[in-house]
Amino acid sequence: MPGAPAPLKAAAAAALTLFASGCQFSVDAEQARICRIALPALNAPGSQIIIERTQPGPGGRSVRLDYRVEGLVGPPLRHWAVCRFAAEGLSASKAELVGVDTDRGPLSGSSVYLLRRFYVDSVEGLMADPGPGDRAAGLREVPEPVAYLAQQVLVSLPRTGIYGLLAAAYALVFGLVSRINLAFGELAAVGAAAAVAGVAMATGLGFSAPLAGLGLGILCALFAGALYSAVAGHFAVARIASRSAQPSLIATVGLSLFLMEYLRLAQSPVTVWIPPIWSDTLPLLRAGSFVVGVTPVSLVTSGVAAAAAAALLTTMHRSGFGRAWRAYADDPKAAALSGVDGRRLLAGTLALAGAMAGLAGTLVVTQYGGLGFAGGFQLGLKALIAAVFGGIGSVAGALVGGIAIGAFETLWSAYFPIEMRDVALYASLIAVLVFRPGGLLGSRDPGPREV
């Protein structure tokens, strides 16, 4: 029986690798910010504080700042401070300051409490943040238009990956049975909720490192997305796939509403957020005072999406499942005569598509912190547009469409009125449907198609 285990195994192996790794590759930006805010309270009023170096402190759960103090009189003075915190990684208490050591001695417990209680979270403290220092020294200078465009391209990377995976989920099902499952956005929300639950389980078990929490979150999201998609798709798609397209379309609309309400009741209307991770900007280029940068979390999100897309394409072109899928999509009767079980193939396809949707939801949580019970609808609609734009029956075309739609949204928001972005996007969809109904990599036939 041709199944769909290869990409799931690849994603699971990646998640286990992340789970086994317990180290961070950057200083926690939130903890570094809190430590910087504490510095003005440790020095003379009116002094200018310039951060020279930020690095992990000794023993974990700490940040060390080397800084220079320039007062109104006297030469500049160099100091250091080590801020210790209650937790690290994905723990909710990682922003709780519990100790401060300096080159002039440690602060007492009462001083740390007063600093945390009345200064760190106050407006005065936020305004006194000296900033991360000049990290742009030595960067390559480029023209300002080039720098601005490069920044927008970097900003679009996570969005293109998320849209691409969701669009591929649409393409997997439509390419096999010519049916659109409108519930993939909600399946992404299911995956996001499962990922948050996985992170909570990891932190509850004592694994607060981001890689460990996200690894378990990815496993939970893959399992939940595949399970919900396979079970729900059996009733909303598989059992009525032999009928006309309208009953299946209506059934998936009902499935979308059901999943949305189910999530609202299961996790409450309040969106659960995970703490920000890997959010310290890495400077790359500069144009005068404008610095082009990217956050490590954006690189992780886009990298995981690219790896999942590569695993999916490899599976579709080189595995037994991919050959069976392409054979059944071309001619179901001939594929059945060759030994392909259409029902089991559709079940595997639904599970694989749900896993891709669940992974997309995990990437939303990783990049933006959370995804509410109603947030999947708009996400799924944009991904459907991406699938149509790239060629809804083509997995590769859907991935290309996700890249195109993500880049289009980002660049339009950067150069044109943002309130007209969705209008322009839907107008572009109409143009594609009129002049190239098969999409970029789909059929060129402009004739009527079953939808």
What are these regions (language model features)?
Residues 240, 245-318, 348, 411, ...:
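Transmembrane helix-bundle core of multi-pass membrane transporters
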Residues 144-162, 315-320, 349-387, 412-423:
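Inter-helical junctions in multi-pass inner-membrane proteins, predominant
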Residues 135-136, 145-148, 266, 270, ...:
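Cytosolic-side transmembrane-helix boundaries in multi-pass membrane proteins
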Residues 170, 205-255, 262, 400-405, ...:
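Alpha-helical transmembrane segments within multi-pass membrane transporters and channels
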Residues 290-371, 395-400:
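Helix-loop-helix "hairpin" substructures at the membrane interface of multi-pass membrane proteins
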Residues 149-200, 231, 235-247, 389-395:
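Single transmembrane alpha-helix segments in multi-pass membrane proteins
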Residues 186-190, 239-264, 375-388, 404, ...:
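Pore- or pathway-lining transmembrane helices of multi-pass membrane proteins that form conduits
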Residues 106-120, 130-166, 194, 206-217, ...:
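Membrane-interfacial amphipathic/re-entrant helices at transmembrane-helix boundaries
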